[in-house]
Amino acid sequence: MKSAKLGFLLRFFIFCSLNTLLLGGVNKIAEKICGDLKDPCKLDMNFGSCYEVHFRYFYNRTSKRCETFVFSGCNGNLNNFKLKIEREVACVAKYKPPR
């Protein structure tokens, strides 16, 4: 994923995550805009659309496990982790903040 696009997605993810804490009453609007971006682990794995080869981790909702896949280098989504520990911090319940 190109750094500018990844930066935008990360900022959007942070906005969606913090919106609940900061704006309280606007939760319904944020939910419509952000949807599952609050939790990258709810997103399906996406290979991307380029032709590079990057081995990455993603959370498989069906098997409830961390699995590897080959990322193409651009596009894709936030369910795409370079390190297994990054995926665990994002997707394992004991590391997630309480809701």
UniProtKB/Swiss-Prot annotation:
It comes from the Eukaryota. CDD domains: Kunitz-type. GO terms for cellular component: extracellular region. It holds the Pfam family Kunitz_BPTI. Residues 1-24 form the signal peptide. Keywords: Disulfide bond, Protease inhibitor, Secreted, Serine protease inhibitor, Signal. Disulfide bonds join 41-91, 50-74. GO terms for molecular function: serine-type endopeptidase inhibitor activity. It is found in: Secreted. Residues 41-91 form the BPTI/Kunitz inhibitor domain. The keyword Manganese does not apply. PANTHER family: KUNITZ-TYPE PROTEASE INHIBITOR 4. This is Kunitz-type protease inhibitor 4. It comes from Homo sapiens.
